[in-house]
């Protein structure tokens, strides 16, 4: 088994095969506290192209003290439908039953996303697997398309989940972030008005039944992740970070656990490269919580303030039944032009405007999709991310670091214009 010690040391979990062209993309990472286990997922493809995705792969990592020992790679052949390719791993852990739900989509043959959007004919199926032994074995695949989407799928040109992890809210609700290309208008047999919008798939009965929430509108949003942050006592807020084609990241808030979101806003602190890129977000509780903080331009702000990003007058405060003093970590390439220099940003006051730090660069050079996981009992953070020397498709690396490294880093740099 391969051992990965902290801090800030990367280990390659999935490596592109130069001879065959086999490529691993779309990382998803889940940490299971009871067994101190990491589950690292990715797509196995016969080339870098989306339409050449084949199946999902998994590696299990065991925390030993403050390092990780990784087991061998396993093909998840359970996560397949006949005549379909499997894409977009999105795992979530249900703490009451101990089950891991692995969501993904199965897309018919080699039908491209563009083809589905142009013709307005969906070729994707919403599926999941369940594991009751921390990812050692998996049950049979279940197709949830009819149950969750039903007849609405006729208006969805295509859709996907995640990619990256889902979460369980303080209330017990399970959340799987998703997005769909909604067809609002047709001309003859063509879908002439199709826009992507993020939404949530959720379960309130420990994963027995699943439903979907409303689209995040009117901003065009796509791949997304969510995190729960502290609002008024008893009223936690769900924060959503979504990819856009608008050069900046979109942020939206929900006060009803993801059923619907208020109008999203573009954050000028969080740049998207020209083609956009997926990003990851997690909430965490820092060891030391000061009463005031300094933002990236040196202005102090009290720890409790009115929230201008929400329609309702929520305040940030500690509550007995809600997450206490929750901050956010966000991973994303920092360049305004291309996918390079993966940065880790933190936000000490998620409900306030423009409170993101400058990025701590986790990986210099080509960097793509990423997924974060918090190891709360060790005060560590893990990141699974695409990277390489010439392009970001060469490998998927795992890195373990402490929140202290991010919070105390003096070598923070502004987003690159390269």
Curated annotation (Swiss-Prot):
Signal peptide: none
Motif FRIP motif location, chain numbering: 24-27
PTM characteristics: Palmitoylated; may regulate intracellular trafficking and anchorage to plasma membrane and endomembranes.
Xref: Pfam families: BNR_2
Entry annotation: catalytic residues: 50, 369, 386
Enzyme Commission number: 3.2.1.18
Distribution of this protein across tissues and organs: Expressed in heart, brain and cerebral cortex.
Reactions mediated catalytically: Hydrolysis of alpha-(2->3)-, alpha-(2->6)-, alpha-(2->8)- glycosidic linkages of terminal sialic acid residues in oligosaccharides, glycoproteins, glycolipids, colominic acid and synthetic substrates; a ganglioside GD1a + H2O = a ganglioside GM1 + N-acetylneuraminate; a ganglioside GD1a (d18:1(4E)) + H2O = a ganglioside GM1 (d18:1(4E)) + N-acetylneuraminate; a ganglioside GD1b + H2O = a ganglioside GM1 + N-acetylneuraminate
Start-end of each BNR repeat: 129-140, 203-214, 254-265
Paired cysteines (S-S): none
Record-listed Phosphoserine modification sites: 312
MF (Gene Ontology): alpha-sialidase activity; exo-alpha-sialidase activity
GO biological process assignments: carbohydrate metabolic process; ganglioside catabolic process
GO cellular component, as recorded: caveola; early endosome membrane; external side of plasma membrane; lysosomal membrane; plasma membrane; recycling endosome membrane
Membrane topology classification: Peripheral membrane protein
UniProtKB keywords: Carbohydrate metabolism, Cell membrane, Endosome, Glycosidase, Hydrolase, Lipid degradation, Lipid metabolism, Lipoprotein, Lysosome, Membrane, Phosphoprotein, Repeat
Superkingdom of the source species: Eukaryota
Entry's pH dependence statement: Optimum pH is 3.8.
Compartment(s) of residence: Cell membrane; Membrane, Caveola; Early endosome membrane; Recycling endosome membrane
Family, as annotated: Belongs to the glycosyl hydrolase 33 family.
Function, as annotated: Exo-alpha-sialidase that catalyzes the hydrolytic cleavage of the terminal sialic acid (N-acetylneuraminic acid, Neu5Ac) of a glycan moiety in the catabolism of glycolipids, glycoproteins and oligosacharides. Displays high catalytic efficiency for gangliosides including alpha-(2->3)-sialylated GD1a and GM3 and alpha-(2->8)-sialylated GD3. Plays a role in the regulation of transmembrane signaling through the modulation of ganglioside content of the lipid bilayer and by direct interaction with signaling receptors, such as EGFR.
PANTHER family in the record: SIALIDASE, SIALIDASE-3
The protein's name in its UniProt record: Sialidase-3
Lineage of the species this protein comes from: Eukaryota, Metazoa, Chordata, Craniata, Vertebrata
Gene: Neu3
